[in-house]
Amino acid sequence: MIGFLIALMVLPLATAVLLMLFRDSAGQNTARWMALIGSVVTLCVAVTTVAKYQSEMVITEASQPVQPRIEWRHTWLTYTPQLDSKSGLTPAPVKLEFYLGADGISLSLIALTALLTISAVLISWETIKERAAEFYICLLVLESCLIGVFLAFDLLLFYVFFEFTLIPMFFMIGLWGGSQRNYASIKFFLYTLVGSLITLVGLVALVLAAVKGGVTTPFSIPELASHFTAHPIPIQTQVILFLTLSAGFMVKVPLFPFHTWLPLAHVEAPTAGSVMLAGVLLKLGSYGFLRICLPIYRQACEQVGLPLIATLSVIGIVYGSLCALSQRDIKKLVAYSSVAHLGFCMLGLFALNAEGVTGSVLQMINHGLSTGALFLLVGMVYDRYHTRQLDDLGGLANRIPLIAVAMVFTSMASIGLPGLNGFVGEMLSLAGMFKVPVVGPFYAVIGTSGVVLGAWYMLTMVQQGFFGPLREPHDVHDPVRDMSPREACAFLPLAVMCVWIGVAPQPFIDLMKPDIQGIVTGYDGSNARTIGGSSGTPESLTAVDR
């Protein structure tokens, strides 16, 4: 199993290196096929890893609050701090490790990343005509960095991959984006970089506190969680560290009011860039909260995180929905819908109970599938009409019926129609918040308004753009082709997953259930409680290679 984890991270990077070596001799078509084959192989490895994870791991009790079920640790540096002059004791050596791991949460997000990368490659097949090899290199490096974030159980490794995701996305927007691509890419880079630098200060302070507390592996996320659960940091210090660490995560989500970089980045990014940005990159913020903040800063999350993040989340849900309702550019409409949908993720996450966190993780996956599919379809419309303005489009179902049907289906999934994927995540997130004493129902009721507003702006977009009298730009004269087989191959896997999760969500919940219960232990006192299953001691699957 350890080999699978390493392969997941190395395969996209190796494909990118091959493309880099042969980019001069390889033509456009060769570059496309190399990128497609590399991304398909990565998805196959991801699916195989999930299947083996479910069927072959030994079931044991979890030894720590946050423990990867598969892990590989390699010590690459040992450092002995200076003698403590006050106590006269020799400090224990501090180890720096290369610590990879996986559990049900990370494997679910890795599979999502691998699936969306294939869709991104296919949708760029004919639209990226200049420097195609370089474009696919950026895309594959981005995939490798994203997978690295989800596999990292070491703070240093996590931060390195977290930051490296900025570089390929910066180039994808800046080199292959729209007319304002330079401004959009710089704004995206600076916004996220400033937030991440503040997060770095929080990480350094956390590591120093761990070293002072005698932790010999101060970068190990599971050991930090275990240590600070048993020996909590004083609440005033904990709140400061929580807020510092949260800065980069809030920008990356993005939470209101740190969202202003997102609409422009989406509008100017190529279709593949928007798919990866909305589908996976925006999940890094909520994943950082889930993986680091919730297990380590428990009192701060309860006393400060819940009211602060829940307030910003419901504001983002309502504000993002109203902004989406006012948009005439379809791509910008979908971008603002992401602000609203990710508000549900954060609302469920900071319910700090099993239902809310389960709904939050499901919503991360569901948003990646449905919004990724929406950006694919918007890109298809733009490729045919060279506009995304609703004022220029209407009655398109008469000309491109397959794309229209796909847009209706995906809009229903995004709204949260029962039977499709969006319903499960939103309802669990809201149910978790309803359980929070005193303030929970207040936040949940406001959040519920986002469901109504979501139906309003998505149905308005579908009705105005795809039904009613035919309205097309004046410069369109040739017969407009409908969805091609290549585009269908990019879209259909996402649609299948939307139906699968909507109709049968339990296997996906079961995959993540023990890990979520480990994270919420100590918050709701329901460590043995399961979602959609029987009560009992939470199970964990462990395989260690040291």
What are these regions (language model features)?
Residues 16-28, 117-129, 171-180, 253-267, ...:
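C-terminal ends of transmembrane helices
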Residues 26-31, 138-141, 145-233, 237, ...:
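Alpha-helical multi-pass transmembrane bundles of energy-transducing inner-membrane proteins
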Residues 256, 371-374, 444-479:
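Predominantly late transmembrane helices and immediately cytosolic-facing juxtamembrane segments
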Residues 4-22, 36-49, 110-124, 142-144, ...:
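Central hydrophobic cores of alpha-helical transmembrane segments in multi-pass inner-membrane proteins
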Residues 1-4, 21-122, 126-137, 216-218, ...:
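Transmembrane helix-loop-helix hairpins at membrane boundaries of multipass inner-membrane proteins
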Residues 1-11, 102-113, 156-168, 238-251, ...:
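Structural signature of hydrophobic alpha-helical transmembrane segments
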Residues 51-97, 197-259, 289-308, 356, ...:
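Juxtamembrane/interfacial segments at transmembrane-helix boundaries in multi-pass membrane proteins
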Residues 16-21, 118-122, 146-148, 171-172, ...:
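Alpha-helical transmembrane segments of multipass membrane proteins
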